[in-house]
From Swiss-Prot:
The keyword Iron does not apply. Belongs to the Wnt family. This is Protein Wnt-3a. It is found in: Secreted, Extracellular space, Extracellular matrix; Secreted. It comes from Plethodon jordani. GO terms for biological process: canonical Wnt signaling pathway; cell fate commitment; neuron differentiation.
Length: 123
C-alpha cells in the first residue's frame, strides 16, 4: 500500500483589531502634502511634495493626504454633517462616545432626570 501526503498552504488575515491598530497608526502619522503644478514637455504635471520640509519625507509605505478632513464638530450642510452639539455623551467613557471627544473640547452639561414609569412588574 502506498502513502499519500497532502501539503496545504494558505494566507490568513490578522485579527481585525491588529488591522485596525495598524491603520490607526498610519493615520496618526500621515504626512500632509501639497499639490504642485509644473509644465513639462508633455503639458502640465501635478506632483505631491511634503508641506513641511523639516519632517522626514514619507516613504512609499506611509499614508499621505493633501486635503484636511472636514470639521465634524460643527454643522456643515455641504458635507451633510449635523455636528456634535446637543448630542448625548458618556461622561465615564474615553472612547468615541465619551464627552471629551464627542463634545470637541467645548465642555458638556450634565443633566439628571428622575422618571416615574409603570414597570408592569409581577410579584
Amino acid at each position: 500500500s502506498g502513502s499519500c501526503e497532502v501539503k496545504t498552504c494558505w494566507w490568513s488575515q490578522p485579527d481585525f483589531r491588529v488591522i485596525g491598530d495598524f491603520l490607526k497608526d498610519k493615520y496618526d502619522s500621515a504626512s500632509e502634502m501639497v499639490v504642485e503644478k509644473h509644465r513639462e514637455s508633455r503639458g502640465w504635471v501635478e506632483t505631491l511634495r511634503p508641506k513641511y520640509t523639516f519632517f522626514k519625507p514619507p516613504t512609499e509605505r506611509d499614508l499621505v493626504y493633501y486635503e484636511s478632513s472636514p470639521n465634524f464638530c460643527e454643522p456643515n450642510p455641504e458635507t451633510g454633517s449635523f455636528g456634535t452639539r446637543d448630542r448625548i455623551c458618556n461622561v465615564t467613557s474615553h472612547g468615541i462616545d465619551g464627552c471629551d471627544l464627542l463634545c470637541c473640547g467645548r465642555g458638556h452639561n450634565t443633566r439628571t432626570e428622575k422618571r416615574k414609569e409603570k414597570c408592569h412588574c409581577i410579584f
